[in-house]
Amino acid sequence: MTSTIANYRVSHSFSPSTSYSLDFTLPSKSISMKNHTTTKTKIHSALLTLPKQNNTPKNQPQFQTSHWNFFQKAAAKALDIVESALVSRELQNPLPKTADPRVQIAGNFAPVPEQSVRHNLPVTGTIPDCINGVYVRNGANPLFEPVAGHHLFDGDGMVHAVTVENGSVSYSCRFTETERLVQERELGHPVFPKAIGELHGHSGIARLLLFYARGVFGLVDHSHGTGVANAGLVFFNNRLLAMSEDDVPYHVQVLPSGDLQTVGRYNFDDQLKSTMIAHPKIDPVSGELFALSYDVVQKPYLKSFKFSPDGEKSPDVEIPLDVPTMMHDFAITENYVVIPDQQVVFKLQEMIKGGSPVIYDKNKKSRFGILPKNAENSENIIWVESAETFCFHLWNAWEEPETDEVIVIGSCMTPPDSIFNECNENLKSVLSEIRLNLKTGESTRRQLLSPSDQVNLEAGMVNRNKLGRKTQFAYLAIAEPWPKVSGFAKVDLSTGEIKKHIYGDKRYGGEPLFLPRNVNSEKEDDGYILAFCHDEKTWKSELQIVNAMTLELEATVKLPSRVPYGFHGTFISSKDLQNQV
């Protein structure tokens, strides 16, 4: 098959085993893509010339194809033939936009190869003296070109790291060496099902059966997890953890050189027996880490737990849910864990009917569970309904004892399932204040921005030193034109006043990270915003450092390679780096 793609003349190795020649003609933006192995394929993404992916696994897989016996080789060949037939049949019908790689990984959503550390990067302006350490950001970066359905969230995890040491800056990016990635790299093609892009309808069931058949013959090993570790990052107990809610975290080290290295799956010394949500919360006062784990197959569908500052896990608290709920984020207050039980749920039986297992259940009532942090069971959880509320992310929550309320700040998204399922209605993400009355069981919700100021706000944070306590400001990505991010906003949560930092014409970024000047700053907004920015005209990327009080640009770091639009990040101080395990 041939394809029309845009923008540059390059050679690109999408996977270690397949080389593609891309012929770009400017300004017509037409590309002919030829596969020099045995198949032809297409992808509508602007791919950039970068070094080839390393063919040599950093971590030796527990199995090797060279050790397969005759029956395994025969089974592998037969199952590959079955999969090829399945893909051919699947591609006879148009893919929905939410599963079409030509949409999901187009332009600067397209993957990049790994980049070894590059030092002494050019800086414009002056980097504040208080910034010493490493800014790390996670994202989805598929190692192999998709052969069928693919959602942005399905990509392999890649961490981008910008290290600042006394004004000198270095950059690197590396795959997180998940069990999934290591096995697929050894096999030379993707075999693990993609949770969103592929697991829908009858073809999704067939893919699951194929995957388990490969497991029966010892061609893959899913006993050590299937996660992609592409969403969240947290530095806890002297470890940088890369996370996605489909697995336990992965421990990633920042090397003294500024490069990155995967240590491996981290289950907190065998204490964590289940998956863990990608947005754990660290209480800035106690130092405890709070987390959730959900299961889409069997009860309990949801569990809550915490870790002490030195990594000791509490017993699980089982949260009673009637159906498994999609729960990407949650919140904490000084005394409570705030659990959103919303209307986007998992119904695997929908696949039998030919549909998606992730659905918007209009008959379900959205609610929040308020669980005491030290609860040993769910007996004292308080449920408060909040009609038609779906927040993909919650930015903060706090208690107001004088009114018996918990205040939740989040971006309410409509249509609720638009990230996962194709919708005709335009997506809206409205910054909202939700007040949950623990005494009456009632709730209210209001938009924080005036109608004239309304913009989509998604991805961001408050000052993490104030997490779980009342905050005045939130720093959030301006998700327009969706799904791109044209800048970020500083919102006064008490007045609704909004100030914006816009990247400029054809320049887009991602999540803004707020970095306090120091932990003892008197003013909540005394610090800096760090954010990647990509220029789609020049195809160059940079790191911007913006004064959080004035929103004036303090410095930019020119990066040696393209940084795709990604997900969430954190900052590790130079002091914490020295204490890494």
Swiss-Prot record:
Catalysed reactions, semicolon-separated: a 9-cis-epoxycarotenoid + O2 = a 12'-apo-carotenal + 2-cis,4-trans-xanthoxin; 9-cis-violaxanthin + O2 = (3S,5R,6S)-5,6-epoxy-3-hydroxy-5,6-dihydro-12'-apo-beta-caroten-12'-al + 2-cis,4-trans-xanthoxin; 9'-cis-neoxanthin + O2 = (3S,5R,6R)-3,5-dihydroxy-6,7-didehydro-5,6-dihydro-12'-apo-beta-caroten-12'-al + 2-cis,4-trans-xanthoxin
Root EC class: oxidoreductase
Any one GO BP annotation for this protein: abscisic acid biosynthetic process
Keywords: Abscisic acid biosynthesis, Chloroplast, Dioxygenase, Iron, Metal-binding, Oxidoreductase, Plastid, Transit peptide
Pathway: Plant hormone biosynthesis; abscisate biosynthesis
UniProt entry tagged with the keyword Transit peptide: yes
Presence of keyword Oxidoreductase: yes
Subcellular location, record wording: Plastid, Chloroplast stroma
Tissue and organ expression note: Expressed in flowers. Expressed in developing and ripening fruits.
GO cellular component, one term: chloroplast stroma
Cofactor comment: Binds 1 Fe(2+) ion per subunit.
GO molecular function list: 9-cis-epoxycarotenoid dioxygenase activity; carotenoid dioxygenase activity; metal ion binding
EC number: 1.13.11.51
Known role: Has a 11,12(11',12') 9-cis epoxycarotenoid cleavage activity. Catalyzes the first step of abscisic-acid (ABA) biosynthesis from carotenoids.
Family to which the UniProt record says this protein belongs: Belongs to the carotenoid oxygenase family.
The protein, known as: 9-cis-epoxycarotenoid dioxygenase NCED2, chloroplastic
Species of origin: Solanum lycopersicum
